[in-house]
Regions:
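Phosphate-binding glycine-rich loops and adjacent basic patches that engage nucleotide phosphates
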Residues: 1-4, 63-73, 104-114
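Solvent-exposed loop and beta-edge segments used for protein-protein assembly and interaction
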Residues: 33, 99, 157-159, 244
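Structured, hydrophobic secondary-structure cores that serve as assembly/anchoring elements
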Residues: 46, 61-63, 69-70, 75-96, ...
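Short Gly/aromatic-enriched secondary-structure transition segments
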Residues: 54-62
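Alpha-helical scaffold segments that mediate packing/assembly in large oligomeric complexes
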Residues: 89-156, 268-281
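Extended, solvent-exposed, turn-rich assembly/linker loops in the middle of proteins
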Residues: 127-195
Length: 281
């Protein structure tokens, strides 16, 4: 891409709209991958109770060895970038490309969105329950659909706290103009942190840009304890006048991955049409 040299223009750069991560902070940090490339997560499997016998042997029942399910996570996302800011070009552009500021711009516009998109798409493919619908939710049924997703988690005894519902602005608009909205708390009054837009049925609503959720996925619900996004490397470096360059060299590397942890199969619930790609891991 060409570098446009400024002549009489403002020293401001029109930075594209960007956003902090929608996902990080809403995932579990229970596991540490320091020193390893893969981890195995063991989930114990409990047994049903039986009637106590007041005579005979094994009055509590026949002892059974506790079983478990095993999930393995292998780190696959090893991403990097490299940018140069030539000192001469920057001088001709009124020094508008400050290295630190350009690094932040790169992270906000490229690195963070790429990781968020990967995470949400990964979580959707690992959903324990997929609600298949023939058409997008409408203002007349979107709130009841959210409650249906909550019921799935309730029936699976997923804890009610730390539940999140990711949806596009299109779906969020439908919630706001829905018939049931008048009986709900005003979503805007419950905003807690960047990206959160209130609550419906114990779900903290996270409004994400179009393209973050996988194609044909209308909403994605997660329980924090069921989704992992471990990072092993988060490097962002600025080299001033490195060999072979008069100017700054910006480099970054991010090594991470995502996993949906079993929580009775329903710590992740998504709704989409029949074309939504899904598999159970």
């Amino acid at each position: 891409m060409a570098i446009n040299l400024a002549t009489k223009y403002s020293d401001k750069i029109a930075e594209a709209f960007s956003h902090a991560s929608y996902v990080r902070g809403k995932v579990s940090n229970e596991y540490d991958l320091s020193g390893v490339k893969s981890i195995k997560i063991y989930t114990p499997v409990t047994v049903d109770e039986n009637d106590y016998q007041r005579s005979g042997v094994n009055r509590y029942g026949t002892p059974q060895e506790m079983q478990d399910t095993v999930q393995e996570l292998t780190m696959t996302q090893d991403k990097a970038f490299s940018l140069t800011i030539d000192k001469g070009n920057n001088k001709d552009q009124m020094n508008v490309k400050g290295a630190g500021r350009m690094m932040q711009l790169q992270l906000r516009e490229k690195t963070t969105p790429a990781a968020d998109k990967y995470a949400l798409r990964r979580f959707a493919t690992l959903a324990g329950k997929v609600m298949t619908v023939s058409a997008k939710p409408t203002k007349s049924n979107i709130v009841s659909t959210i409650f249906d997703m909550g019921q799935i988690m309730d029936d699976a005894q997923v804890p009610e706290d730390n539940r999140y519902m990711y949806m596009t602005a299109e779906m969020y608009k439908l919630v706001n103009i829905s018939d049931e909205f008048i009986s709900l708390d005003k979503l805007g009054e419950k905003s807690i942190s960047r990206g959160e837009c209130g609550e419906v049925d114990n779900f903290r609503i996270i409004k994400v840009p179009t393209g973050y959720l996988p194609a044909n996925c209308f909403m994605l619900a997660t329980y924090k304890g069921s989704v992992l996004m471990p990072y092993k490397i988060q490097d962002a470096k600025i080299h001033q006048d490195p060999p072979g360059l008069s100017g700054n060299l910006l480099e970054g590397r991010h090594y991470y991955d995502c996993l949906g942890k079993y929580f009775k199969g329903c710590g992740i619930v998504c709704i989409g049409n029949e074309y939504l790609f899904h598999y159970s891991s």
